[in-house]
């Protein structure tokens, strides 16, 4: 009798034993009615409650638990599918490059930890369902991480590795009447774990669906469908290859929108290939995901119906032409994102509801491609991408970044796996084959990927050769060849991670033999994605650059409760696990938890839009970047807003052919009355889609112009009251008090109510973003934080009791101007000046000036910070919106009037950091529920300003590693600034904000704005 030998788990050549051959993911039904209901009686769901035992290592696992005489019915219960770490056993561990056992056990590639390597033992007692009795019986584990051994009634059935493709076994030989005992043992780390070092949380267990299944007398075990148009695209070949158990006949029907295109019958016997010609096929693309319905009815030799196989078919031609990747003859641009399969509730077991939400948000924001980083996803996503229209790079389960990193440190590349090692080759080919066989019939998949960040070598080259041979209708991708050029033909395209735009240009200038893609770019960690437009603009000017995939879609965070029982989004290290890479798991353009789009998505949507509207005061140039659809399938709307309020609307009929442009006169005349006007041209869905309702905006452009008005002078004057310690200024409804002693604006009363909670101060700091932390901004700019916190009107060089700088007071005919000079504790010492000019109507023009000190360089921000009572919790602004904007991330924003709560401006980044800023603000106000508060206006000479209203200061945010660590809210903190530096985002481990988005400190800096009570 065959037995299981645990010692083989650390052998890279032992990765399958008794496992069924991989096959396509088609579903088969007993008849047409079942197919219509999508409920197959050939399957029996094994999801649910299993008996469970947890052990820290194999030595602690219960021996011979699989035997029928060993009763496991008093074991713990566990849900399946689920990671055991999400069910209270072991803990989730997040690690990026480093292997999770590093520093705990000294092992080498192929070896496995012995001291701590959790073993999950599962038992399921069951009786074979009546309709399955007497038939061949199989079991499918759609995903078990990372190795699974299986027994039935004490008999060893088999063993399988590859955490991300199905492991299926035949049980027929060992099944019996009455109660059966199915036992499985899942090992967290096996030899193959050296090739599963992806940047994610480390889990284990049976985490995807499990089901029993039977097959009819005649059964199509594997199905390959190819629907490829010829070069003219006027006809296509439909080729179907079947691998059948038993003999019989198949009736094949291909239809489109209810009309039959093909109806035919063919004999079935073993492996068969059938082909038909389809005239004028309707082609599939992400822009217009047209699918045909294929139905295969399988009959035995007696003419009895055995099974019905429904399958969606997309006709499309993807190929390399003259060194350019083309889809249906057109140069394709990937407007993509990397997507880890992740849920804050259940780890890598993602529900259909969560998945559909992801895909809808992607489509709504013009994302047209997914890279399944860095493993095959559960099957449903491929079906939905076919339906929704999303291109896919399907990636093999391979990443050995840790071994490569060790080799980089030691310069000993023999440490790398799989590299050129023959003992790893079969495992690599098996993983490639398992993915290919399961997913091969999905139109959405354009490219097979050999894996991620595993250096290079012969083994990966052989994987690419397998894909090329198995599937000449798709291309093959692998980024790692850029680090090891020995096997440069591994990848059909040049793929790199996080190169600058200049680096891409330089590379293509030297070598344009292949098209170039960024398999990862614009690292979206925290407040990021600055200057993303430079990459997307490059796709318009450099034909060989064909787009990229943002890193990545969703924050990998897990619901956890703090010590007071309040849920928060936990990241690496929050479960007590070490080693870890902490919050590096949070790189999404969507939040963990509820999966909502983060503020970064606004910029992604604009940069990825397929229609460009270049608007002027009286016309619009419409550039249609779509490859296949005319702009006439969208409603085009034109609005004119005066000072933020829409005053006119119109529709515009457009009919711009794909990859063409047209200029249209606007249906609304240019305005002549004084004011600022925003002309917006936008495109919207005419009809409902599976991913959005009619009316959803897919693209826009905006043009701003002004009609000047004569300036109005303030007729009222002010009364000035001077004393030793204070300078008072009084008007009709307000009173201002400037403190000589405390060095600043101590009071601003409006309508009898004190408005400010603390003296406003110059501010040069922001709470560091994740990108700032990665490029050591705190070390480089730290003096500006100290300057912001400890500047003083007193000269610290004269001791703590030295005299303060007396403010300068300038009394004019109707105004008074008070100016403070602040010394800043920088090296060398520097100073700034803050002046307040008070007008008779309560307006206070505030001006901050700074004469740059060369040694100090640029600063994060240049503005003034205010504290108000937290009752002022409402914000309204006329500027860019609706989400936060920054100097290098504002192209996707529209000028308008927006409103929200102060708390809403705290973006839900996993680590508190700079957020909520508003660019190009003309005016903004913070008010209480009665409408009382403070109005801030730009100064006409300075132009629009940056505005921020948050519940916390930058220093409070910087001190918190989680949102729950932030203090109770006591204030509304307003920052008004000339600007702040951009957020950057080329990467999060050193790349700095681009030069043009830094604050210039090469000449005198000055910033003015006005505030007034409401």
Give the residues covered by each predicted segment.
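Catalytic cores of secreted or luminal carbohydrate-active enzymes
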Residues: 196-220, 565-621, 625-635, 641-645, ...
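Extended substrate-binding grooves/exosites of carbohydrate-active enzymes
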Residues: 1-38, 155, 194, 305-619, ...
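An acidic-aromatic loop/edge-strand motif
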Residues: 83-86, 91-112, 161-163, 171-236, ...
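Extended acidic/polar, glycine-enriched regions
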Residues: 175-179, 241-319, 677-716
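Beta-strand/loop-rich accessory regions of lumenal/periplasmic or secreted enzymes
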Residues: 85-86, 93-95, 143, 188, ...
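Accessory carbohydrate-binding/adhesion or oligomerization-edge regions at the termini
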Residues: 1-101, 185, 257, 536, ...
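Intrinsically disordered, low-complexity Pro/Gly/Ser/Thr-rich segments with frequent PxxP/GP/PP motifs
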Residues: 265-279, 644-674
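Accessory beta-strand-rich segments of carbohydrate-active enzymes
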Residues: 2-4, 8-10, 14-16, 20, ...
């Amino acid at each position: 009798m065959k037995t299981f030998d645990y010692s083989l788990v650390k052998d890279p050549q032992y990765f399958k034993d008794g496992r069924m051959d991989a096959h396509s993911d088609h579903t088969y039904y007993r008849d047409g009615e079942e197919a219509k209901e999508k409920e197959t009686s050939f399957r029996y769901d094994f999801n649910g409650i299993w008996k469970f035992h947890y052990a820290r290592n194999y030595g602690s696992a219960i021996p011979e638990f699989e035997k029928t005489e060993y009763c496991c019915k008093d074991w713990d219960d566990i849900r399946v599918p689920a990671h055991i770490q999400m069910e209270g056993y072991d803990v989730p561990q997040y690690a990026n490059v480093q292997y999770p056992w590093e520093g705990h056990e000294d092992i080498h590639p192929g070896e496995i930890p012995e001291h701590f390597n959790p073993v999950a033992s599962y038992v399921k007692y069951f009786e074979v369902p009546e309709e399955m009795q007497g038939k061949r019986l199989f079991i499918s584990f759609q995903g078990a991480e990372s190795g699974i051994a299986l027994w039935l009634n004490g008999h060893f059935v088999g063993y399988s590795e590859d955490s991300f493709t199905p492991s299926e076994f035949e049980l027929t030989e060992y099944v019996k009447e009455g109660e059966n005992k199915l036992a499985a043992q899942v090992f967290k780390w096996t030899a193959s774990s050296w090739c599963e070092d992806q940047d994610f949380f480390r889990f284990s267990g049976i985490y995807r669906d499990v089901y029993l299944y039977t097959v009819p007398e005649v059964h199509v075990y594997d199905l390959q469908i190819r629907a490829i148009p010829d070069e003219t695209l006027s006809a296509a070949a439909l080729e179907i290859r079947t691998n059948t158990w038993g003999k019989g006949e198949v009736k094949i029907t291909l239809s489109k929108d209810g009309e039959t295109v093909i109806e035919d019958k063919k004999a079935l016997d073993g492996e068969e290939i059938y082909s038909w010609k389809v005239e004028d096929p309707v082609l599939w693309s992400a822009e217009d995901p047209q699918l045909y319905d294929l139905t295969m009815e399988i009959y035995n030799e007696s003419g009895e119906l055995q099974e019905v196989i429904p399958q969606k078919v997309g006709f499309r031609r993807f190929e390399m032409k003259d060194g350019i990747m083309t889809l249906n003859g057109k140069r394709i641009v990937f407007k993509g994102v990397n997507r880890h399969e992740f849920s804050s509730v259940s780890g890598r077991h993602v529900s259909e509801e969560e998945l559909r939400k992801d895909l809808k948000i992607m489509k709504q924001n013009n994302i047209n491609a997914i890279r399944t980083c860095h493993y095959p996803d559960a099957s449903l996503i491929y079906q939905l991408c076919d339906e929704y229209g999303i291109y896919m790079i399907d990636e093999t389960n391979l990443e050995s970044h840790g071994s490569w990193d060790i080799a980089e440190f030691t310069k000993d590349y023999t440490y790398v796996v799989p590299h050129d090692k023959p003992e790893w080759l079969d495992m690599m080919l098996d993983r490639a084959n398992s993915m290919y066989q399961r997913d091969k019939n999905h139109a959405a998949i354009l490219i097979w990927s050999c894996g991620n960040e595993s250096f290079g070598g012969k083994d990966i080259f052989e994987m690419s050769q397998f894909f090329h041979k198995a599937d000449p209708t798709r291309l093959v991708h692998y980024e790692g060849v850029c680090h090891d050029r020995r096997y440069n033909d591994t990848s059909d395209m040049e793929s790199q991670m996080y190169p600058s735009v200049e680096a891409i240009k330089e590379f293509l200038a030297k070598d344009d033999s292949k098209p170039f893609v960024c398999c990862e770019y614009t690292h979206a960690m925290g407040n990021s994605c600055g200057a993303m437009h430079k990459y997307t603009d490059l796709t318009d000017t450099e034909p060989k650059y064909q787009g990229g995939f943002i890193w990545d879609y969703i924050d990998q965070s897990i619901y956890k409760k703090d010590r007071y029982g309040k849920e928060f989004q936990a990241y690496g290290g929050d479960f007590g696990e070490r080693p870890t890479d902490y919050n590096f798991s949070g790189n999404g353009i969507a939040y963990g938890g509820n999966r909502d789009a983060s503020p970064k998505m606004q910029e992604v949507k604009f940069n990825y839009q397929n229609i460009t509207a270049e608007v002027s005061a009286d016309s619009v140039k419409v550039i249609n970047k779509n490859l296949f659809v005319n702009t006439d399938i969208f409603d085009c709307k034109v609005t004119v807003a005066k000072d933020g309020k829409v005053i006119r609307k119109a529709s515009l009929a457009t009919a711009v052919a794909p990859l063409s442009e047209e200029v249209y006169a606007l249906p609304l005349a240019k305005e002549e009355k004084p004011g600022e006007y925003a002309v917006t041209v936008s495109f919207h869905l005419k009809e409902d889609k599976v991913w959005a309702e009619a009316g959803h905006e897919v693209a826009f452009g905006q043009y701003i112009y002004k009609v000047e008005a004569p300036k109005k002078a303030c007729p009222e004057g002010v009364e000035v009251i001077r004393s030793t310690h204070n300078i008072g200024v009084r008007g009709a409804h307000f009173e201002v008090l400037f403190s000589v002693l405390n060095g600043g604006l101590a009071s601003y009363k409006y309508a009898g109510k004190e408005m400010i909670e603390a003296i406003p101060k110059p501010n040069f700091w922001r709470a560091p973003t994740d990108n700032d932390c990665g490029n050591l901004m705190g070390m480089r700019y730290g003096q500006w934080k100290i300057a912001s916190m400890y500047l003083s009107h007193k000269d610290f060089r004269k001791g703590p009791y030295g005299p303060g700088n007396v403010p300068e007071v300038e009394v004019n005919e109707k105004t008074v101007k008070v100016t403070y000079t602040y010394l800043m504790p920088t090296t060398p010492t520097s100073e700034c000046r803050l002046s307040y000019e008070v007008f008779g109507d309560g307006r206070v023009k505030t001006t901050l000036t700074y004469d740059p000190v060369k040694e100090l360089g640029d600063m994060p921000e240049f503005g003034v910070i205010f504290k108000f009572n937290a009752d002022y919790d409402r914000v309204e602004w006329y500027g860019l919106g609706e989400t936060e904007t920054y100097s290098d991330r504002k192209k996707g924003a529209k000028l308008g009037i927006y409103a929200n709560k102060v708390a809403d401006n705290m973006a839900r980044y996993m680590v508190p950091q700079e957020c909520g800023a508003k660019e190009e603000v003309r005016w903004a106000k913070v008010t209480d529920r009665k409408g009382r508060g403070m109005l801030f206006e730009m100064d006409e000479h300075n132009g629009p300003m940056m505005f921020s209203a948050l519940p916390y200061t930058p220093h409070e945010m910087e001190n918190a590693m989680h949102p729950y660590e932030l203090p109770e809210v006591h204030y509304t903190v307003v920052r008004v600034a000339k600007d702040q530096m951009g957020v950057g985002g080329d990467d999060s481990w050193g790349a700095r904000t681009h030069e043009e988005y830094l604050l210039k400190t090469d000449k005198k800096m000055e910033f003015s704005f006005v505030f007034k009570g409401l």
